[in-house]
Amino acid sequence: MAPSVTIDNISDFSPITTTTKTTSFNLRTLLLAPPSIASHEEKLRNVLATHDRSVTDLQMLDRLSAGLVTLPESTYDLVLILTDADGTRAESTELLTRDVFGKITQALKTGAKLQAQDGTFGQEIDGAEYREAILAGLVTEGGVMLKPDHSASVAVPLRLRRKDNSKTTAVSNAGPPVSTVEVPVSGKRKSVDMTEDVPEKDVPKNDVPKGVGFIDFSDDFDAEDDDDELIDEDTLLTEEDMKKPLAIPPECAPRAGKRRRACKDCTCGLAEKLAKEDAEKRATADSQLQALKLDADDLAEVDFTVKGKVGSCGNCSLGDAFRCDGCPYIGMPAFKPGEEVRLLNNDVQL
């Protein structure tokens, strides 16, 4: 009897099919941590445990502020600013400068959010944090700061109402008046409706466009031209005001040592005081110089023709280097004994 043979048609290498859950999209998150949290590993580990590490990035705020880190553009759906190690946001708020806000805004996707871990970001409208976020291009929606969508264009119809022929109407040289114009926010003209034709002869011309006025700067608005009503500046201060002592600031008060210079727009009286002192010193010096001047009547003649007549020291003719302190010829050049010396207007003539 022949043995029976059974053939197994099932493949031994058939892979086991497993079902995987796929999400339509993954929200990419960026965590910005202050420097103080780097030394508290436990707190940082607890924060990372609440986020999916496959779609979560961690950056330090101080490195971002110093320009050591570059964020990719239009990448993150959520940027979360972590609190400091002590539970506040004092350190992170100091690092959030205008430059850092600009980098964060570029890294956000359209409609992405910028939040803080404690939920207090952008709550104070008068705060510097809120102002810098608005200047960076973020908007507030539902109490959350997010990046708006600037690509969407909205058509704004501009309806130009027609007026009767009796009223003036501005006419364009390019053609008949336009009834409806739709202009998108992006600045590009979408459509122009120019179906209505109006003859130019039926529209009266007006040299002055509507809404344009002219200002006559010479018009005094019917004010009375009375120059007597001008205030005399000499009457602003009374005699009692002039008697009051001047309030000199402490920095302008006289001090020992180097004399202080007056300010350019001095109002405390220091400039006048210094000018008066300088004038007195100049007058005193001029009076002293005036006493030393010799007039034409003050001519003196010294005759040394008499032989054998010498001074007390005998060195008068040798020069100042050999003359005594009381010599009347100090300042005169050396001369020969017996030579006639004349003093004419303080000039020595030999």
Curated annotation (Swiss-Prot):
Compartments reported by the entry: Cytoplasm; Mitochondrion intermembrane space
An annotated GO BP: iron-sulfur cluster assembly
Positions of region (N-terminal SAM-like domain): 23-156
MF-aspect GO terms: 2 iron, 2 sulfur cluster binding; 4 iron, 4 sulfur cluster binding; electron transfer activity; metal ion binding
Region annotation Disordered: where it falls in the sequence: 165-209
Keywords (A to Z) from UniProt: 2Fe-2S, 4Fe-4S, Cytoplasm, Iron, Iron-sulfur, Metal-binding, Mitochondrion
Entry binding sites for [4Fe-4S] cluster: C313, C316, C324, C327
Domain notes: The C-terminal domain binds 2 Fe-S clusters but is otherwise mostly in an intrinsically disordered conformation. The N-terminal domain has structural similarity with S-adenosyl-L-methionine-dependent methyltransferases, but does not bind S-adenosyl-L-methionine. It is required for correct assembly of the 2 Fe-S clusters.
Family of this protein: Belongs to the anamorsin family.
Subunit record text: Monomer. Interacts with TAH18. Interacts with MIA40.
Protein name: Fe-S cluster assembly protein dre2
